Amino acid sequence: MNPSDLASASPAPVDTNASPAWQEQFAFLADLIPQLVWITDPTGFHTYFNQRWIDYTGYDLAASVGPDMWNNLLHPDDQQRAREVWGHSLATGDDYSIEYRFKARNGGYRWFLGQALPRRDAEGRIVAWFGTCTDIEEQRKMREQLEAAYSDLEAKVMFRTLELEREVHDLRKKLADQPGLD
Amino acid sequence: MLYYCMSDLLLDINLQQLPDDYLAGHWQVASRVLNQNNPASPLALATRLQLNPGQLLAEAPGLPEAAAGTWAVQRDELLQRPYLRFNLPQEQTNALVTRLRRSADGQHSQLNLYFASGMEMQLEQSEFPRL
């Protein structure tokens, strides 16, 4: 996406205190960065998605109401864990961080790092959660390849060690079987 | 060429639960790194390995006939994966199974072996349906 196309790409977040110009700049910046960006109210209801979110997931704010979006978006193996982690952050105000798989519009899953921080008012009450989802599919693949390579290497070393032990054992047996040698 | 197009569709098989019959069949040698292995040995020269029940045939171009011997699947509790015992008149060696990948329909397989000499070999198998 060309940055020049972004000015009116996604709706600006609703913030009655912010000027229209500021809201437009926020939306421009949020659409420019490579992450999916979202904002929720203190109870976890979404109030803003950037254009990348909408383009990747196919869900805009209107479609995000209710449980369907998360049930459809999240990989079935990640849904329970995601609910628990997000629920913990909402209940405690702790920073949110999780790796999970999101389904794209085309039906394929990719790994994302979801992170969010609460924004608080002067009294320390949470007024909103600001979150991003960073595509880590390639890093996950690299990590899995590295883990597989390490596991292979470990197995090879063990295999060669056992082979060497067998050879030493056979050699000792041959020497022991030779008459005149102790 | 069709096989290579499909290689992305091959799935890793858990080597701790690998059925022995997944290793049998007629394998093409796709690639090989000799390392310390004798380059003139039958397995170093082979372009095709037939792992039939109880019988091993190592075929190499330029040789009048395939080297014939036996093979067997071995397991050691210290290793988390099986290894193969190859017995040929000119060569007796073991090879660790480092990876086995198969298509969902079992028609295509890719087998990686690591020999005691350090030789690494990738074998491929395709069973196209007969028309």
Residue spans for each PLM region:
Chain A
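Per-ARNT-Sim (PAS) sensory domains and their PAS-associated C-terminal
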Residues: 91-94, 98-116, 125-127
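PAS/Per-ARNT-Sim sensory domains
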Residues: 65-68, 72-88, 98
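PAS/PAS-like sensory domain cap-loop motif
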Residues: 53-65
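Conserved hydrophobic beta-strand signature of PAS-family and PAS-like sensory domains
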Residues: 46-47
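Sensory-domain cores of signal-transduction modules, predominantly PAS/LOV
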Residues: 35-36, 43, 96-99, 156, ...
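PAS-associated C-terminal cap
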Residues: 1-25, 77, 134-148, 153-164, ...
